[in-house]
Amino acid sequence: MSKKKKKSPGTLAENRKARHDYNIEDTIEAGIVLRGTEIKSIRRGSANLKDSFAQVKNGEIYVHNMHIAPYEEGNRFNHDPLRPRKLLLHKREIEKLGTRTREIGYSIIPLKLYLKHGVCKVLIGVARGKKKYDKRQDLKDKAVKRDMQRAMKDRY
């Protein structure tokens, strides 16, 4: 059984399934607007990016379906776990993302949630969905590469 990969020090949550389901063409780092109980919950490690996506509306960009579990000590000040969260980007970056997502087949997917100098950031990617045969081809390529690595290792 393979060992579980360690997260890099600042990484709080990662959407590993996104790289399997989508071809990521471009990535952008964005800030995110969070409430106090949300950041405490994220720092505790209870954020989930699975099935999350971003949408451009009225010149602003929001992340939907990003689950942040309620903070246990937050009592009545707790947040809604699935509320849309605003991303902080420059206007021209939002316009660029908006034009890309208007093309058929493109989506904005959050890839990673991490801390940078004590501030929470989201790495978002402009992605196009993979077809089933694309996924199979990627798995075959990965297996071939692994076999080549094994052969090279045995050689030396």
UniProtKB/Swiss-Prot annotation:
Matching Gene3D superfamilies: 2.40.280.10
Molecular function GO labels: RNA binding
Keyword check for Cell membrane: no
This protein's record includes keyword Cytoplasm: yes
Lineage top rank: taxon: Bacteria
A GO biological process held by the record: trans-translation
UniProt keyword list: Cytoplasm, RNA-binding
Xref: InterPro entries: SmpB, SsrA-bd_prot, SsrA-bd_prot_CS
Places the protein is found: Cytoplasm
A Pfam family this chain is assigned to: SmpB
Matching CDD domains: SmpB
Gene Ontology CC entries for this record: cytosol
Function comment: Required for rescue of stalled ribosomes mediated by trans-translation. Binds to transfer-messenger RNA (tmRNA), required for stable association of tmRNA with ribosomes. tmRNA and SmpB together mimic tRNA shape, replacing the anticodon stem-loop with SmpB. tmRNA is encoded by the ssrA gene; the 2 termini fold to resemble tRNA(Ala) and it encodes a 'tag peptide', a short internal open reading frame. During trans-translation Ala-aminoacylated tmRNA acts like a tRNA, entering the A-site of stalled ribosomes, displacing the stalled mRNA.
HAMAP family recorded: SmpB
Family, similarity comment: Belongs to the SmpB family.
Protein's recorded name: SsrA-binding protein
Origin species: Staphylococcus carnosus (strain TM300)
